[in-house]
Amino acid sequence: MKKIIHLEKILWDECDKITKLKVNKDQKSFVAPNADSLIDAYFAITEEGIKVYPFGIYYGRKAVGFIMIAFDCPWATKYYGLPEKFYYIWRFMIDRKYQGQGFGKEALRLAIKFVKTFPAGKSEACWLSYEPENEGARSLYLKVGFVERLDLHKEDMEIPAVLKL
């Protein structure tokens, strides 16, 4: 059954809900804490001028996850040799209490729908990357249409994947 969720811009009074979300213990090495992600977004915006879109993932009024999308990330271009002018799902997590219920798949669909509005400019692709050991993320990303780019994968790096827009 499809879960009715929505993405919300993170406002000051909602920030605490987002920073309290946690993944399972065995997933902690795969994603940064949400507080760290919000700090990263702040510095990317203020120091590098990168367009960053952090969203809370909500089921009704209940925060169940976090996703952060960026546009034209110089570090991804550098590490993976990606083209300029692309969207990048920089961070994505579903709280441990809500995993396995369809929230992740639906949240990614909503994020892709948002990206296809081209809020920061036109692009041909949306990229993301994940740890090679993170089979759950890999399976989810492939289900929603991302294609692994193993030709760009380097040892000790995350695996890049692309979705044509």
Where are the predicted features?
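Acetyl-CoA-dependent GNAT
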Residues: 4, 9-91, 95-97, 114-118, ...
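Terminal substrate-recognition subdomain of acyl/acetyltransferases
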Residues: 142, 147, 152-165
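Active-site acidic-Proline motif in GNAT/NAT acetyltransferases
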Residues: 95-97, 101, 132-133
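Conserved beta-strand-loop-alpha-helix junction that forms the acyl-donor binding cleft
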Residues: 122-138, 154-158
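Conserved beta-strand segments that form the floor/walls of ligand-binding pockets within enzyme
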Residues: 88, 93, 127-129, 160
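Conserved acetyl-CoA pyrophosphate-binding loop and the N-cap/start of the following alpha-helix
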Residues: 98, 102-110
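Conserved active-site alpha-helix within GNAT-family acetyltransferase domains
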Residues: 105, 132-150
